[in-house]
């Protein structure tokens, strides 16, 4: 969705999730069956693609931009299932770092060619999480009967794009000294989707930590070494 065609991919996914949730709710009402929990995916885009002094928590409302509205609609459809008396958990996921695909694949390209540099201003925050941690959080949400409502799934601490890109270069043993890659280049390549890399909010994971979750990869260096180094 992040790097697909927003005019079709995201809209199709939006409708698909809402329609699927509606079908699930209708079927549950028809059969009278009630699962022990309903776990739904959302994103930190719920808070909007902004860089500011604010640190967002689960109590903050949705942004009015495109992605914020998409996330709001996803969550609304999930809570309609929760209205049936089913424990409902919403996982607001940050940028998932994984070995292949996704945002990290785009981020490492400059470093691979020895031209590591920030993307755009470099001041934008990156609310990230390692793939292993997000999977573990979903498992916890299924098993932990005390969990309900929204949870931010982002690694502890806050890092901006310049810091993350420099860490990528260091982990890969590449230089990091080139001027920032201009924002307009990403806008030319990805259009509106470029906001995923060029903007970002600080998002607090304190609620999931208070629930008892301990991050396997709490800092970008350990996460990137796991993902980018040969084992």
Residue ranges and their predicted role:
Residues 15, 51-90:
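Catalytic helix-loop patch of NAD(P)-dependent Rossmann-fold dehydrogenases
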Residues 108-116, 124-158:
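Alpha-helical substrate-binding/gating segment
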Residues 62-67, 94-101, 121-131:
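Glycine-rich "substrate-gating" loop/helix at the edge of Rossmann-like oxidoreductase active sites
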Residues 21-65:
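Conserved Rossmann-fold NAD(P)-dependent oxidoreductase catalytic core, especially the SDR/UDP-sugar
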Residues 1-11:
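Single conserved hydrophobic/aromatic residue that forms the stacking wall/gate
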Residues 72, 84-86, 97-106, 141-151:
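Glycine/proline-rich active-site loop of Rossmann-fold NAD(P)-dependent oxidoreductases
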Residues 195-231:
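C-terminal amphipathic/interface module of NAD(P)-dependent oxidoreductases
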Residues 144-192, 225-231:
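Mid/C-terminal beta-alpha module of Rossmann-like enzyme folds, strongest
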